[in-house]
A protein has these predicted regions:
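Non-catalytic alpha-helical scaffolds and adjoining flexible linkers that form interface surfaces
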Residues: 1-20, 25-255
Length: 255
């Protein structure tokens, strides 16, 4: 059976002298593994359609008895030149691909998550120099949590329904169990969570509701970047019941 779908290439590895095994995220079939024969040959018919972070229309031979499918054809439909030529954009896209690889189960589709990823890739390729492209990695994580059923609330307490105003306190408690910032009068003793300063809460509120152009236009300090990165990886680990440690960090940062 031949299946065709929109796909984003996540990563791959060599398989024989001329072939590759690739992991891709498709819109309607979720994450799948494919074998691309001849893709490493100088005469490959695939061109750049199977390169990492490429958005391509993919056709493959599907079988219910296999979990590795043979590629029939692939054609790139979203250019990536302005991503590949900009290191900051490229690092952000690789980080997003890493999240899709580690959080998504095989053949479990989330069309809205695919559309968000494609939207970010399109935005990066159409835009010129961005002030802080890596901010969109955090936006992506926030939206991914929502798609996976454990979205976060940074504007309202999930217990009281009270709106969170960063002017009310220097620090706020985020409950991992409730998935939200808690009102100041809620007793959080014994709850698993993290104390966030008002600056970080303000950043998370912006990243949660802002447009891509706005979210990539302001700087986040190195210390706040590490705090947000650690906070989100812990949150995903708790709700997915497996540890996530994403290795791709913003330019100049290491973990």
């Amino acid at each position: 059976m031949i299946r065709t779908d929109s796909a984003i290439i996540l990563h791959g590895r060599k398989f024989s002298d001329t072939s590759k095994i690739l992991h891709v995220y498709t819109r309607n079939h979720g994450k799948i593994s494919i074998l691309a024969k001849g893709v490493r040959s100088s005469k490959s018919k695939f061109g750049s359609s199977l390169e990492v972070i490429s958005c391509s229309t993919l056709s493959w031979y599907h079988s219910t008895q296999k979990d590795l499918y043979l590629v029939k054809s692939a054609e790139q439909y979203t250019p990536t030149y302005h991503i590949l030529s900009d290191y900051d954009k490229l690092i952000t896209c690789i980080a997003i691909a890493e999240v899709l690889s580690t959080t998504q189960e095989n053949e479990e589709s989330h069309p809205e998550l695919f559309d968000l990823t494609h939207q970010i890739l399109q935005f990066f390729n159409k835009s010129q120099i961005l002030k802080s492209p890596y901010n969109l990695f955090f936006t992506f994580l926030i939206k991914t949590a929502l798609c996976m059923g454990f979205g976060m609330s940074f504007h309202k307490c999930n217990i009281t329904g009270e709106l969170i105003d960063i002017r009310d306190s220097e620090y706020f408690f985020f409950s991992y169990y409730e998935g939200s910032i808690l009102s100041l009068d809620v007793d959080h003793s014994g709850q698993q969570g993290i104390l966030l300063n008002s600056s970080i809460v303000s950043i998370l509120q912006k990243l949660d509701t802002g447009l891509l152009d706005d979210n990539s236009s302001f700087n986040i300090s190195s210390s706040d970047t590490f705090t947000i990165h650690d906070f989100l990886s812990r949150y995903f680990s708790i709700h997915s019941h497996k540890k996530f440690t994403w290795r791709t960090m913003p330019p100049g940062a290491t973990i």
